[in-house]
Amino acid sequence: MGLKNFLEKIEHHFEAGGKLEKYYPLYEAAATIFYTQGKVTPGASHVRDAIDLKRMMILVWFAVFPAMFWGMYNVGYQAIPALNQLYSGAELQQVIAGDWHYRLAQMLGASLTPDAGWASKMLLGAAYFLPIYAVVFLVGGFWEVVFSIVRKHEINEGFFVTSILFSLIVPPTLPLWQAALGISFGVVIGKEIFGGTGRNFLNPALAGRAFLFFAYPAQISGDLVWTSADGFSGATPLSQWSVNGSHSLVNTVSGQPITWMDAFLGYIPGSIGEVSTLMILIGGAIIIFGRVASWRIVAGVMIGMIATAYLFNWIGSTTNPLFAMPWYWHLVLGGFAFGMIFMATDPVSASFTNKGKWWYGGLIGVMCILIRVANPAYPEGMMLAILFANLFAPLFDYVVVQANIKRRKARGE
């Protein structure tokens, strides 16, 4: 019996009147992973396309893979030298034995010696990232199933994207219970209470991270959370620049200066998926050419960022080194690139109109640099900038629509 025949055989149990009727969303979610339903919409279909919501979300899911795999490698790349720098001999073995991440990596065949190869670094990174992703995926999926059963509608695939995006914008050392709490806030408060996928006005992944940032700042920011070596303290390059400008950009493990190319490629500490601008841009090309993300938003963010960075460069400051940061450094440090490509382009919480997308993207670019530079105590502004712009997205669309109405009325007079 083929899979399709099996699914068709049990389908009547989940349909209206069947003994498993209330679990139809679970059946529908499982069945549509492999097959597309004949009826895609319950009402009149005004736009026909070869791609549905599930396929669109899966495209975004695959697009983050380059940043995800590089992020896992970079976790090990940063952690193993730091671990061997802090400890040696019996003390090192004691530290390894006391941390389940290290033990798991060794069970998988990883070496934690100074000469560890790329595979060992990847395995250690996976030992940190995959548990976070598994917890976030299961908890986020649980809430999606609960609300789908209560509301009696199909399970929306948005949580596939939300779960992996959330997992990539947190530090690798984030406690698993906080990961579960953060995604719960993002899905329930940031999305489901407004009606679910398509009705939320905030990006749920960013809403969850913002909750953790304000509720548990010690585990989501600071100098202790970015390198996965017990007891190691190392600031991110963005934090270093805020202290003494470009001269303070130093790899806290090797002691070598950090070049722009190091930051662009992703050899710096940071959130798991935000370190490599190159990998992020590869994923961005996939979703932009796939027409899932809007190039207008990306261009608007870049224009707003470059203009504001030049403005602060022109103003200058003798007390705040961030005034002098060039725009091309803003691009590769912190969460700017990841937020611009994968967060700002969220089709639900962003502006819908073409002109509105330009203004929406521009506001994000301006606010990101404004928060970074004007608030050196928090030298990262992309998360708050996008959430702030989410609130203005409906206003931009309203202004654009009203302007179009007035212009058309004027033509008819």
Curated annotation (Swiss-Prot):
Enzyme class: translocase
GO biological process, one term: transmembrane transport
Catalysed reactions listed for this entry: a ubiquinone + n Na(+)(in) + NADH + H(+) = a ubiquinol + n Na(+)(out) + NAD(+)
Record-level Gene Ontology MF annotations: FMN binding; oxidoreductase activity, acting on NAD(P)H, quinone or similar compound as acceptor
Annotated InterPro entries: NqrB, NqrB/RnfD
Chief location bin: membrane
This protein's record includes keyword Metal-binding: no
A cellular component annotation (GO) from this entry: plasma membrane
Domain of life: Bacteria
EC number: 7.2.1.1
Keyword annotations of the record: Cell inner membrane, Cell membrane, Flavoprotein, FMN, Ion transport, Membrane, NAD, Phosphoprotein, Sodium, Sodium transport, Translocase, Transmembrane, Transmembrane helix, Transport, Ubiquinone
Membrane topology of this protein: Multi-pass membrane protein
Subcellular location: Cell inner membrane
Pfam families on file: NQR2_RnfD_RnfE (PF03116)
TM regions (residue ranges): 56-76, 123-143, 169-189, 270-290, 297-317, 322-342, 358-378, 381-401
FMN phosphoryl threonine, modified sites: T236
Cofactor(s) the record lists: FMN
General function of this protein: NQR complex catalyzes the reduction of ubiquinone-1 to ubiquinol by two successive reactions, coupled with the transport of Na(+) ions from the cytoplasm to the periplasm. NqrA to NqrE are probably involved in the second step, the conversion of ubisemiquinone to ubiquinol.
Homology family: Belongs to the NqrB/RnfD family.
HAMAP family: NqrB
Self-association state and partner proteins as the record states: Composed of six subunits; NqrA, NqrB, NqrC, NqrD, NqrE and NqrF.
Stored NCBIfam families: nqrB, PRK05349.1
Protein name: Na(+)-translocating NADH-quinone reductase subunit B
Gene this chain is encoded by: nqrB
